[in-house]
Amino acid sequence: MTKCSVTIFKAAALFSFFGAVAVSCGRNAGDGGAFVVSPSAAIDGLHAPWDCLDDRTLFRCFSDGESFYFSYEVTDTTPTYAANFTGEATVENEDRVEIFFSPKRSMDDYYCAEIDPLGRVLDYSGHYYRDIDYGWGFRTMRLVGQLTENGYIVAGKVSKDELRKLGCDLENGFWMGVFRADYHTDMTVNWYSAVSTDDISPDFHKPEVLFFTKIR
């Protein structure tokens, strides 16, 4: 079994609902410039150009007839999370991974989940620019997180029907963002994105950090 297969099966082992979905190692081949969700879809490493940093986060995703599945394997020597979780706002000061979905690149409407190392979530909807509704949440998203020797793994799934109802055209294309916040013991933070930009400071609520995605 390849290293990439081991990674996704470690994440899948956290979920009974992942079942026996088989995945193989490899990079997503793309489709007319799109990131194609398939058994080999992967993003190996995120970027913080504003801090001149890259990390070793491995993001993988695949789908079946009902759900879109995703996992992050994060290398982090200082996992930062709250022992006393008092609600979704707690996630704002923790290490976390983030996934954004938007029907259009303009981000007229977009939907976000920010997930800490233990699988606890802050989810919300937004309208460009930063018109956020923290009262909104995914109905079908299921999440789990687990600390590892080298950091943590987060895995999740969301119903494809829910994504469609949110306006995402899964087969013909929608926009997705993959991000990470890495807090340190002094509470400084590095912000990582799958898409590297020329910005001098991080801002994930803008179209430039999203990438075009299709689900086969």
Which residues does each predicted region cover?
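Accessible peptide chain termini
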Residues: 1-2, 29
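Bacterial N-terminal signal peptides that target proteins for export
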Residues: 2-12
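Bacterial N-terminal signal peptides
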Residues: 10-20
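Structural preference for beta-rich elements and adjacent junctions enriched in aromatics
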Residues: 25-216
